[in-house]
Amino acid sequence: MNFTKLFAIVLLAALVLLGQTEAGGLKKLGKKLEGVGKRVFKASEKALPVAVGIKALGK
C-alpha cells in the first residue's frame, strides 16, 4: 500500500471534517466574550456613580 497516497487522503479528510468545526468553536467563544464584555460594561455603569460619590448626586 502506498503510504504517501493514504496519508494524503487521511489528511484531506481531516481538513474537511475539522475545518468546519473550527469556525463554529471560534464563533461561540466570540459570543461568550462579547457577553462578558457587556456584563462588565453594565456593572461599571452601575458602580461608577458610587465611586464618584458627590459628583454623581447632581453637582
UniProtKB/Swiss-Prot annotation:
Q: Which residues form a coiled coil?
A: none
Keywords tagged on the record: Antibiotic, Antimicrobial, Immunity, Innate immunity, Secreted, Signal
Gene Ontology cellular component terms for the protein in this record: extracellular space
Localization, per the record, is:
Secreted
Q: Which Pfam families match?
A: Cecropin (PF00272)
Please name the InterPro entries in this protein's record: Cecropin, Cecropin_insect
Per the UniProt entry, the signal peptide is: 1-23
**One of the protein's GO biological processes:** antibacterial humoral response
Primary localisation category: secreted
Q: What does this protein do?
A: Cecropins have lytic and antibacterial activity against several Gram-positive and Gram-negative bacteria.
Could you say which protein family the record assigns here? Belongs to the cecropin family.
Task: Write down what this protein is called.
Answer: Cecropin-A1
Q: What is the lineage of its organism?
A: Eukaryota, Metazoa, Ecdysozoa, Arthropoda, Hexapoda
Recorded name of the encoding gene: CECA1
